[in-house]
Design a protein with these regions (language model features):
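ABC ATP-binding cassette signature C-motif
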Residues: 1-226
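Flexible nucleotide-interacting loop at or near the entrance of a catalytic core
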Residues: 4, 97-105, 219-279
Protein backbone atom coordinates (compact mmCIF):
# COMPACT_ATOMS: atom_id res chain seq x y z
CA UNK A 1 0.00 0.00 0.00
CA UNK A 2 1.24 3.49 -0.89
CA UNK A 3 2.44 5.75 1.92
CA UNK A 4 0.78 8.78 0.31
CA UNK A 5 -1.94 8.97 -2.32
CA UNK A 6 -2.79 12.12 -4.29
CA UNK A 7 -6.11 11.64 -6.06
CA UNK A 8 -7.35 14.09 -8.72
CA UNK A 9 -5.93 17.14 -6.95
CA UNK A 10 -6.96 20.45 -8.45
CA UNK A 11 -6.18 23.99 -7.38
CA UNK A 12 -6.44 27.23 -9.33
CA UNK A 13 -5.46 30.82 -8.62
CA UNK A 14 -7.06 33.57 -10.71
CA UNK A 15 -8.24 31.05 -13.26
CA UNK A 16 -4.82 29.41 -13.75
CA UNK A 17 -4.49 25.80 -12.63
CA UNK A 18 -1.59 25.15 -10.28
CA UNK A 19 -2.72 21.53 -10.17
CA UNK A 20 -5.00 20.05 -12.80
CA UNK A 21 -6.42 16.68 -11.71
CA UNK A 22 -3.07 15.47 -10.39
CA UNK A 23 -2.84 11.86 -9.18
CA UNK A 24 0.34 10.33 -7.79
CA UNK A 25 1.59 7.77 -5.25
CA UNK A 26 4.53 7.90 -2.86
CA UNK A 27 6.02 4.60 -1.73
CA UNK A 28 7.96 4.09 1.50
CA UNK A 29 11.67 4.77 1.16
CA UNK A 30 11.46 7.03 -1.87
CA UNK A 31 13.41 10.29 -1.85
CA UNK A 32 11.64 12.53 -4.33
CA UNK A 33 12.91 15.86 -5.63
CA UNK A 34 10.00 18.11 -6.67
CA UNK A 35 10.97 20.36 -9.59
CA UNK A 36 9.28 23.20 -11.41
CA UNK A 37 9.81 26.81 -12.34
CA UNK A 38 9.34 29.55 -9.77
CA UNK A 39 5.66 30.20 -9.16
CA UNK A 40 4.43 26.84 -10.48
CA UNK A 41 3.06 25.79 -7.07
CA UNK A 42 5.70 23.51 -5.56
CA UNK A 43 5.43 25.01 -2.08
CA UNK A 44 1.64 24.99 -2.39
CA UNK A 45 1.72 21.26 -3.13
CA UNK A 46 3.89 20.58 -0.07
CA UNK A 47 1.53 22.63 2.09
CA UNK A 48 -1.41 20.70 0.67
CA UNK A 49 0.19 17.38 1.57
CA UNK A 50 1.00 18.74 5.05
CA UNK A 51 -2.66 19.72 5.52
CA UNK A 52 -1.99 23.47 5.55
CA UNK A 53 -3.66 24.18 2.19
CA UNK A 54 -7.03 22.90 0.99
CA UNK A 55 -7.35 21.85 -2.67
CA UNK A 56 -10.29 22.97 -4.80
CA UNK A 57 -10.96 19.30 -5.49
CA UNK A 58 -9.37 15.92 -4.86
CA UNK A 59 -7.66 14.42 -1.84
CA UNK A 60 -4.24 13.86 -0.21
CA UNK A 61 -4.37 10.71 1.89
CA UNK A 62 -1.57 9.52 4.16
CA UNK A 63 -1.70 5.81 4.96
CA UNK A 64 -3.39 4.94 8.25
CA UNK A 65 -1.17 5.35 11.30
CA UNK A 66 1.55 7.21 9.38
CA UNK A 67 2.93 10.67 10.17
CA UNK A 68 4.20 13.53 8.01
CA UNK A 69 6.32 16.52 9.08
CA UNK A 70 6.84 19.73 7.10
CA UNK A 71 9.90 21.99 7.19
CA UNK A 72 8.88 25.33 5.62
CA UNK A 73 11.20 27.46 3.53
CA UNK A 74 11.36 30.40 5.90
CA UNK A 75 12.09 30.45 9.63
CA UNK A 76 8.93 31.68 11.44
CA UNK A 77 9.41 35.19 12.81
CA UNK A 78 7.72 34.34 16.10
CA UNK A 79 10.00 31.41 16.91
CA UNK A 80 11.24 31.84 20.49
CA UNK A 81 12.45 29.96 23.56
CA UNK A 82 15.23 27.52 24.28
CA UNK A 83 16.15 24.94 21.66
CA UNK A 84 14.98 22.06 23.86
CA UNK A 85 11.51 23.55 24.36
CA UNK A 86 11.07 24.36 20.67
CA UNK A 87 11.90 20.78 19.67
CA UNK A 88 9.93 19.08 22.46
CA UNK A 89 6.82 21.11 21.66
CA UNK A 90 6.42 19.06 18.46
CA UNK A 91 5.64 16.05 20.68
CA UNK A 92 3.03 17.81 22.83
CA UNK A 93 0.09 16.30 20.96
CA UNK A 94 1.46 12.76 21.29
CA UNK A 95 1.97 13.35 25.02
CA UNK A 96 -1.50 14.82 25.56
CA UNK A 97 -3.10 11.90 23.70
CA UNK A 98 -1.17 9.39 25.79
CA UNK A 99 0.79 8.00 22.85
CA UNK A 100 4.09 8.61 24.67
CA UNK A 101 5.09 9.58 28.20
CA UNK A 102 6.62 12.94 29.09
CA UNK A 103 9.97 11.34 29.88
CA UNK A 104 9.98 9.70 26.46
CA UNK A 105 9.34 13.05 24.79
CA UNK A 106 12.23 14.56 26.72
CA UNK A 107 14.56 11.70 25.79
CA UNK A 108 13.59 11.84 22.11
CA UNK A 109 14.12 15.61 22.04
CA UNK A 110 17.54 15.38 23.66
CA UNK A 111 18.59 12.62 21.26
CA UNK A 112 17.66 14.52 18.09
CA UNK A 113 19.17 17.77 19.40
CA UNK A 114 22.46 15.99 20.03
CA UNK A 115 22.28 14.40 16.57
CA UNK A 116 21.89 17.87 15.03
CA UNK A 117 24.89 19.18 16.95
CA UNK A 118 22.80 21.74 18.85
CA UNK A 119 22.88 23.06 22.42
CA UNK A 120 19.60 22.36 24.26
CA UNK A 121 19.87 25.39 26.55
CA UNK A 122 20.60 28.07 23.96
CA UNK A 123 17.85 30.59 23.16
CA UNK A 124 16.86 30.14 19.53
CA UNK A 125 16.74 33.91 18.96
CA UNK A 126 20.53 34.05 19.39
CA UNK A 127 21.20 31.52 16.62
CA UNK A 128 22.13 32.18 13.01
CA UNK A 129 19.57 31.49 10.29
CA UNK A 130 21.36 28.25 9.45
CA UNK A 131 21.32 27.02 13.05
CA UNK A 132 17.64 27.93 13.33
CA UNK A 133 17.00 25.74 10.30
CA UNK A 134 18.71 22.88 12.11
CA UNK A 135 16.40 23.42 15.09
CA UNK A 136 13.37 23.32 12.79
CA UNK A 137 14.65 20.15 11.15
CA UNK A 138 15.12 18.60 14.60
CA UNK A 139 11.55 19.56 15.44
CA UNK A 140 10.33 17.97 12.20
CA UNK A 141 12.28 14.75 12.83
CA UNK A 142 11.58 14.29 16.54
CA UNK A 143 8.06 13.02 15.82
CA UNK A 144 9.67 10.21 13.79
CA UNK A 145 7.70 11.01 10.63
CA UNK A 146 7.18 8.43 7.94
CA UNK A 147 7.14 11.24 5.37
CA UNK A 148 9.35 14.33 5.61
CA UNK A 149 8.42 17.37 3.51
CA UNK A 150 11.25 19.88 3.00
CA UNK A 151 10.94 23.25 1.25
CA UNK A 152 14.37 24.57 0.21
CA UNK A 153 16.19 22.79 3.07
CA UNK A 154 19.60 24.27 2.19
CA UNK A 155 18.43 27.89 2.50
CA UNK A 156 20.67 29.89 4.88
CA UNK A 157 23.01 26.93 5.39
CA UNK A 158 26.78 27.15 4.93
CA UNK A 159 28.67 24.52 2.94
CA UNK A 160 29.52 22.44 6.01
CA UNK A 161 25.88 22.35 7.11
CA UNK A 162 24.71 21.42 3.61
CA UNK A 163 27.18 18.53 3.44
CA UNK A 164 26.02 17.34 6.86
CA UNK A 165 22.36 17.51 5.76
CA UNK A 166 23.07 15.60 2.55
CA UNK A 167 24.73 12.76 4.45
CA UNK A 168 21.98 12.68 7.05
CA UNK A 169 19.15 12.51 4.50
CA UNK A 170 20.97 10.00 2.30
CA UNK A 171 21.20 7.59 5.25
CA UNK A 172 17.78 8.42 6.71
CA UNK A 173 15.39 5.48 6.32
CA UNK A 174 12.21 7.51 6.04
CA UNK A 175 10.49 8.85 2.93
CA UNK A 176 11.34 12.28 1.60
CA UNK A 177 9.64 14.80 -0.69
CA UNK A 178 11.57 18.03 -1.12
CA UNK A 179 11.93 21.21 -3.15
CA UNK A 180 15.38 22.64 -3.83
CA UNK A 181 17.21 24.89 -6.28
CA UNK A 182 20.51 23.30 -5.23
CA UNK A 183 21.23 20.91 -8.10
CA UNK A 184 24.18 19.29 -6.33
CA UNK A 185 22.01 18.55 -3.31
CA UNK A 186 19.30 17.21 -5.63
CA UNK A 187 21.74 14.89 -7.40
CA UNK A 188 23.09 13.46 -4.17
CA UNK A 189 19.80 12.97 -2.31
CA UNK A 190 16.93 12.29 -4.73
CA UNK A 191 16.29 8.87 -6.26
CA UNK A 192 13.05 9.94 -7.96
CA UNK A 193 11.86 13.15 -9.61
CA UNK A 194 8.45 14.79 -9.67
CA UNK A 195 7.90 17.78 -11.93
CA UNK A 196 5.13 20.35 -11.74
CA UNK A 197 4.71 21.92 -15.17
CA UNK A 198 1.68 23.92 -16.34
CA UNK A 199 -0.60 22.23 -13.83
CA UNK A 200 0.57 18.72 -14.64
CA UNK A 201 2.37 16.66 -12.02
CA UNK A 202 4.58 14.08 -13.71
CA UNK A 203 6.68 11.36 -12.09
CA UNK A 204 10.07 10.23 -13.38
CA UNK A 205 11.47 6.97 -12.04
CA UNK A 206 15.09 8.07 -12.25
CA UNK A 207 17.69 10.36 -10.73
CA UNK A 208 18.18 13.98 -11.76
CA UNK A 209 20.71 13.67 -14.60
CA UNK A 210 18.68 10.97 -16.35
CA UNK A 211 15.57 13.12 -15.83
CA UNK A 212 17.22 15.99 -17.73
CA UNK A 213 17.79 13.74 -20.75
CA UNK A 214 14.28 12.30 -20.72
CA UNK A 215 12.69 15.72 -20.17
CA UNK A 216 14.57 17.24 -23.12
CA UNK A 217 13.34 14.42 -25.34
CA UNK A 218 9.76 14.84 -24.08
CA UNK A 219 9.80 18.60 -24.75
CA UNK A 220 11.13 18.04 -28.26
CA UNK A 221 8.36 15.52 -28.96
CA UNK A 222 5.78 17.96 -27.56
CA UNK A 223 7.02 20.74 -29.84
CA UNK A 224 6.78 18.50 -32.90
CA UNK A 225 3.29 17.33 -31.96
CA UNK A 226 2.13 20.90 -31.40
CA UNK A 227 3.62 22.03 -34.70
CA UNK A 228 1.74 19.30 -36.58
CA UNK A 229 -1.48 20.19 -34.76
CA UNK A 230 -1.08 23.90 -35.55
CA UNK A 231 -0.39 23.16 -39.22
CA UNK A 232 -3.53 21.03 -39.44
CA UNK A 233 -5.58 23.71 -37.66
CA UNK A 234 -4.32 26.40 -40.04
CA UNK A 235 -5.34 24.23 -43.01
CA UNK A 236 -8.82 23.75 -41.56
CA UNK A 237 -9.19 27.49 -40.95
CA UNK A 238 -8.40 28.10 -44.63
CA UNK A 239 -10.99 25.50 -45.59
CA UNK A 240 -13.76 26.95 -43.39
CA UNK A 241 -13.27 30.38 -44.95
CA UNK A 242 -14.22 28.93 -48.32
CA UNK A 243 -17.76 29.08 -46.98
CA UNK A 244 -20.15 27.09 -49.14
CA UNK A 245 -18.28 23.78 -48.90
CA UNK A 246 -18.39 23.93 -45.11
CA UNK A 247 -22.16 24.42 -45.11
CA UNK A 248 -22.85 21.18 -46.92
CA UNK A 249 -24.41 18.49 -44.70
CA UNK A 250 -21.66 15.99 -45.31
CA UNK A 251 -19.10 18.48 -43.95
CA UNK A 252 -20.83 19.09 -40.61
CA UNK A 253 -18.56 16.57 -38.88
CA UNK A 254 -15.51 18.39 -40.19
CA UNK A 255 -16.87 21.69 -38.85
CA UNK A 256 -17.43 20.13 -35.41
CA UNK A 257 -13.89 18.74 -35.48
CA UNK A 258 -12.56 22.22 -36.29
CA UNK A 259 -14.42 23.72 -33.35
CA UNK A 260 -12.92 21.06 -31.09
CA UNK A 261 -9.44 21.82 -32.44
CA UNK A 262 -9.94 25.52 -31.75
CA UNK A 263 -10.92 24.73 -28.17
CA UNK A 264 -7.91 22.47 -27.65
CA UNK A 265 -5.59 25.16 -29.05
CA UNK A 266 -7.14 27.79 -26.80
CA UNK A 267 -6.64 25.62 -23.72
CA UNK A 268 -3.05 24.70 -24.49
CA UNK A 269 -0.51 25.96 -21.97
CA UNK A 270 2.74 26.70 -23.73
CA UNK A 271 6.14 25.62 -22.48
CA UNK A 272 7.63 28.40 -20.32
CA UNK A 273 9.38 30.91 -22.56
CA UNK A 274 7.27 29.96 -25.59
CA UNK A 275 5.00 32.49 -27.27
CA UNK A 276 1.35 31.63 -27.81
CA UNK A 277 0.44 31.41 -31.48
CA UNK A 278 -2.79 33.21 -32.36
CA UNK A 279 -4.68 31.94 -35.40
Amino acid sequence: MALLTLDDLSLAFRGVHVLDNASRFVESGEKIGLLGRNGTGKTTLLRMIAGDQEPDAGTCVLASGKRASFLPQEVPGDLSGQVFGVVQEALSLQVSEGQIETWEAEAKSKQIIDLMGLDSDVDISSLSAGRKRRVLLARALVTEPDLLLLDEPTNHLDLEAIEWLEKFLASWRGTLLFVTHDRGFLRRVANRIWELDRGRLSAWECEYDEFLKRKAAALEAEEKQNALFDKRLAEEEVWIRQGIKARRTRNEGRVRALKQMRQERQQRREQPGKATLAI
